[in-house]
Amino acid sequence: MIYNDRLGEVMDLNTLIKIIEKVGRIEIEDIKITADELIINIPSAPPIVIPQTPSIKEKLAEEGIIEIKDVPELDWEPPVEKYPGYIREVQFGKPKSEGGRGKVVKIGGQRALYRFEEPQPNPPVVTFDIFDIPMPGLPKPIRQFFQDVMEDPCEWAKKCVKEFGADMITIHHISTDPKIKDKSPKEAAKLMEDLLQAVDVPFVIGGSGNPQKDPLVLEACAEVAEGDRCLLASANLELDYKKIVDAAMKYDHNVLAWSIMDPNMARDLNRKLVEAGLDPNRIVMDPTTCALGYGIEFSINAMVRLRLNGLKGDELVNMPMSSGTTNAIGAREAWMNNPEWGPREYRLPLWEITTGITMMMCGVDLFMMLNPISVKTLKEIGKTLTTKPGEVKLNTNNYEWIVSP
C-alpha cells in the first residue's frame, strides 16, 4: 500500500501501475511505502572494456601491403656471460664462539653482474645511519620517526634494530669536528663502547669528515670494538690512511675505501691500502653516490666499470661496494615543500629508494640509508637478487587498478 501524506489517501500499488502505464510517466512526492518485502534492483555500471585496436602490422595486412605468416616459436636463452674473476666476500661482526657479539653479516661473493647470469650468494645489506648529536637539518619525513631518540644515540640505535629491523648501524661521530663540538677521540670511543652494549648488530664506524681528526677518532673507536669486525669509514687519499689501516689490522676490522667517481682513483687507493699491509679481503669500496637528478649517471659509470673489471680478474678492484644512499635526501625535489610536487612524505623515500635501486643494479652490496620506509623497501627488493628468475611470482595483471566508476 502507498500512502500520500499531502492528499491523505491510500493508493493500491496496482492502481499506481495502471496510472503509470496510461500516462507513461508519473512523479511522486511525499509518499510512504508499506510492504512485507521490498526488493530494489539497481543496475550496476557496465564494466570497462579495454578497446582492442589493430596493430600497424594488422592494418598493413588488411590493406594488402604486407602478408602475415605464422612465425614458428623459437627458443631463447638470455646472453649469459662467464667471468674469469669474482667479487671478494667481506664479513662484518663475529659469532660469540670467535669472541664477537653474535650477529654476522656478509656481503659480496658474486661471480656475475646480472641476476639471470647467476644469483648472488649474499643479499644486499642496508645499514641505518645514526648520529652522535641531534641533526636539526634532517627533513621532517625522517625526523618524525626518530624525534624521540635523537638526543640519545644508543636509544636511536635500539629503535633502528627493534622497530625497523636494522641489520647494521652506521654511527657518524659528527661532534668530533673541531668546527662543531670538537669532542675528543676518547669521548667518541666511550660512545662507541656504549653502542656496542646497546645493540648486537655489526657497526660501520664513521667520523665527521675532518681529515685531521678522523684517523684519530677511528683508531680510538677501533680499539674499544676490538675483534668485532666493524667497518672503519673511511680511508681516502686526503688523510692519513695508514693510521686507519694500522688500526684495522691491529684490532681486526674492515676498511671503507672512499674515492670520487673515478675507477682509476679507486684502484690506486686500494693498491696503497694493500701496500700498507691491509688484507684485500678487508676492503669495501665507496666510489661515491650522487642522488637521482644530481649526477647519478656518473656514479653508475664508475660502479659498473669497477664491478666489471673485478669480475674480469682485476684483483685490486674485485671488492664489494658501498653506497651512501642517504645522499639522495639532499636533493631539493626530495625534501622541499612544494604542493605541485606532491607530499614530501612520499617524495623523500621514493627519491632514496630510486637512488638505491639504481645503485643495486650497478652491483652495490652495502647501502647507508636513513628513512625506515626506504630501508624496508630496498631490503625486500634486494632479496630477489639471491633467487633465480621465475622463483619470484609477479602480478602481471596490468589492468587490475582499473575499476568501474
Swiss-Prot record:
Example GO biological process: one-carbon metabolic process
A Pfam family the protein falls into: CdhD
Domain of life: Archaea
Assembly: Heterodimer of delta and gamma chains. The ACDS complex is made up of alpha, epsilon, beta, gamma and delta chains with a probable stoichiometry of (alpha(2)epsilon(2))(4)-beta(8)-(gamma(1)delta(1))(8).
UniProt function note: Part of a complex that catalyzes the reversible cleavage of acetyl-CoA, allowing autotrophic growth from CO(2). Probably maintains the overall quaternary structure of the ACDS complex.
Family per record: Belongs to the CdhD family.
Protein name: Acetyl-CoA decarbonylase/synthase complex subunit delta
